Amino acid sequence: MKKLKYFTKRKTEFNGFLKNQDKLGESGKKIIIAAATAIFTISLTFSLAPRKTYVNPGISPSASYVVAHAGGALEVNGKSLNYLNSVEGFQKYYADGTRMFEYDLVFSKEGKLVATHKFEYFDGYSMKNPIPYETYTQTKIAGKFEGMTEDKLFEVIEENPDCKFIIDTKEKNETNVYERIVELAKEKEVDISKSILPFVTSKEMLENINKMYDFEEIMLTNYKKNYTTRELLHIIDSCDKIKYLHIFPVDFINIDINEINKKGIRVFAHMDKRNKARTALDYGCTGIFSDDISENEFKEKHYDFMVSKLETVKEIPLPRKQEKHSIEVELSF
């Protein structure tokens, strides 16, 4: 839809350009518009088709392929609820092999970090009217679940050194959120270099993150700036800590994923719907952000297809599933 809106806007601008050309007759305008539309249609048709195979960016047997979006969806009364950012989401998906988790952190009224996307489960609160920390901790998300707070996040980090946490935020100054995380890490004397995977939205943010802390890896995301392939490659070349690129489905035709793969960068696509996950793999991605697909489910149902889309597939053995008994989980829905 975003792609179609983009081309609609471009066509509107093109028509405006033609109206200002006094020397061009009405019939001439129609001919040029028809030709431009035909070229657009042909280019869009071809750009939508995925390649037969893509360069293997260098996935390994121990790699993770799923990021639990907002901590992962949970079921309540037979309905799957997303954007929970809950502790129980971490527990459930960890138990099913997932080792990469994305949480949305914002500041409470007192300046502490709490997890929420857009206050979906906290009536009366917003970015302009932050929730008090005590109110957040005393509120059960969807009436059942514990929200992730800054203190709980550090508990989870210390107890699960095999996990990576990707921190997104709707705060206008994203760097402030990471400054708070680094401040907490120093106070608690916790090494977050491997546990926190910065979710970088721009070149400016990348510079700030690199000055702030020596993170081992960084994930670049294209969902705010909509960079071109050339711009993305320039940013990637400027920082060897960038190991991942996060995109939305619109980027399947906006950027050349194969060129990103050639740099050894793994592309993770944001695929909310379970039945759409394979589309990302068809376009050369080697990871997904998902509300409800676990790591073990991915490896069971989608891994072989992903491998079939990558060159030198014989060098990529099927990874073993994570053991489900790694953590005990008690959930009541």
Q: Which positions does each model-derived feature cover?
A:
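Phosphate-group recognition and catalysis centered on beta-loop-alpha active-site segments
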Residues: K3-Y6, R10-F333
